[in-house]
Amino acid sequence: MRIDCTVASLTALASGCQALSTRPYVPRGHSLSRRDDSAPIYRDASYCIDERVDDLLARMTIEEKAGQLFHTRLMDGPLDDEGSGNNAHNSTSNMIGEKHMTHFNLASDITNATETAEFINRIQELALQTRLGIPVTVSTDPRHSFTENVGTGFKAGVFSQWPESIGLAALRDPYVVRKFAEVAKEEYIAVGIRAALHPQVDLSTEPRWARISNTWGENSTLTSELLVEYIKGFQGDKLGPQSVKTVTKHFPGGGPVENGEDSHFAYGKNQTYPGNNLEEHLKPFKAAIAAGATEIMPYYSRPIGTEYEPVAFSFNKRIVTELLRNELGFEGIVLTDWGLITDGYIAGQYMPARAWGVENLTELERAARILDAGCDQFGGEERPELIVQLVQEGTVSEDRIDVSVRRLLREKFVLGLFDNPFVDPESAGRVVGNDYFVRLGREAQRRSYTLLSNNEDIVPLKKIEQSTKFYIEGFNASFIESWNYTVVDSPEEADYALLRYNAPYEPRPGGFEANMHAGSLAFNDTEKARQAKIYSTVPTIVDIVMDRPAVIPEIIEQAKAVFASYGSDSNAFLDVVFGVSAPEGKLPFDLPSSMEAVEAQMEDVPFDTRNPVFKFGHGLSYANPCASSSSKCS
């Protein structure tokens, strides 16, 4: 029986009904003419969502259903562009028109919000021209911080710029996390992005792992508290037309990778639990599910030395179906991480399919195994013909495909995409990177600084002469010169040295792999000796960008003051040094005392390095901290 959604609006969320809350934006020259008395049920917003899903699903061919199960990258540019060489790919027109795909990850830098909104509108126009007119869901990796790696995230560009997630954890302010998520949501929606391929709630129990900066550290309680605010900020109390859906990753926790090596790569495919501590890594996912997480992504890794089969998590039925769905009660969408079926290239680097533990399976067999495990959608793949073949051969039933397609379609209806797929490009230009959002991000950058040491209370440098000379490394002289101080060429000429260093890492080859900071957490002996000469020559203030917990006992001992930062520009650094802002951050992880201690610790156990230089929660305050709530000094 048809339910009148006008009458039922007060119980819409409970009944599956949802009426439009805003008038849809319609691009010039286009009319949503399908909405008339003869429109099918799925096109009629007065029907309830479940009825609309049922109607649409019944109209779909197996080819159209198969297209929904794939979620791959989308490059800004001509819709018929197929790339070339190692960057060859199916054109957007082909993926939407021929492969029936409607889920895409925008994998380009955004340099102009208006133009990006116009581009996504063109994508939606193309989708509406298909037989069923299913709108596109556009997703993105994180875009609001300082990391630039096509496989994991993008620099903020035109968006407001905030600390990495690890910096929000250092700040330990749930309000700031909620505000960040609300701001990011508004900026995403403005350009047409409706899915966030984050938060990353892995516990950073292995200090060498290359992906710590997007986590909230190694404490499960803090991570769980902050991720709730994050999800609520993006989605609201309930997913709806004003939401950006989140994808919580990487189940069942990607932190305890063997020897800290990342499972994007074959040498890092193993995940290990020498402390028998899987349950600790599940705690953030339990919190996410309780907070309304609608989508979860397993990681590439395969568990070793556990009760589970040593195959990658998305191929692992006991992980996805028995643990995630049955034991934890998750009823939403499971999206695999990228590239589990097909070999390919990332940033020009050859990357075999991350089918760890099932490398011997054919592409067809891999697809079948992933579906059998309980996953709904294949990330980073564009192979719907495999699903069609599996159904036609009888290997996978169409009913099984319908289960996943129903979840995916329902989400599009809940987000309001069938009724309002377009965005206003002019509004995007006003919303994205507006002054208020930018100011909030800059304040968070400054507040998240962690003061590790402050010998003789050298910072803040508030009472220094205008003739003071600075030796600097790691940032441009123009930042100091804007304060009307002089920059000199050597430590011997300087009154103070200001140094900004990335946390140590061992460079790796390859276009993609080179961007993953991995290996040793300590500076090599040559670099230590070079730095020591500076520390012995002039009072030195050091900032270490802690994308991983650096092993720097020698810097703590020799420098006058040491900060940890987690994504900030040089203006933020100088504001903290000169006392315009005060550091409020607390360490979101232990700082190890040596690489020997790192190598001896157990990958799955938090706070497990011997005699850390500083423990989780360490962070000094200035002797005379600013009194205002914004931590600004007059």
From Swiss-Prot:
Entry keyword rRNA-binding: no
GO CC annotation, single: extracellular region
Keyword Hydrolase attached: yes
Any one GO BP annotation for this protein: cellulose catabolic process
EC number(s) on file: 3.2.1.21
Residue positions the entry lists as glycosylated: 90, 112, 219, 270, 360, 476, 484, 524
One GO MF term attached to the UniProt entry: beta-glucosidase activity
Pfam families: Glyco_hydro_3, Glyco_hydro_3_C
Main location, first listed in the record: secreted
Catalytic activity: Hydrolysis of terminal, non-reducing beta-D-glucosyl residues with release of beta-D-glucose
Entry keyword set: Carbohydrate metabolism, Cellulose degradation, Glycoprotein, Glycosidase, Hydrolase, Polysaccharide degradation, Secreted, Signal
Signal peptide (UniProt feature, chain positions): 1-19
Pathway annotation from the record: Glycan metabolism; cellulose degradation
Subcellular compartments: Secreted
Active site feature: 337
Transmembrane segment boundaries: none
Job description of the protein: Beta-glucosidases are one of a number of cellulolytic enzymes involved in the degradation of cellulosic biomass. Catalyzes the last step releasing glucose from the inhibitory cellobiose.
PANTHER family, sorted: LYSOSOMAL BETA GLUCOSIDASE, PERIPLASMIC BETA-GLUCOSIDASE-RELATED
Family per similarity comment: Belongs to the glycosyl hydrolase 3 family.
The name this protein goes by in its record: Probable beta-glucosidase C
Organism per entry: Aspergillus flavus (strain ATCC 200026 / FGSC A1120 / IAM 13836 / NRRL 3357 / JCM 12722 / SRRC 167)
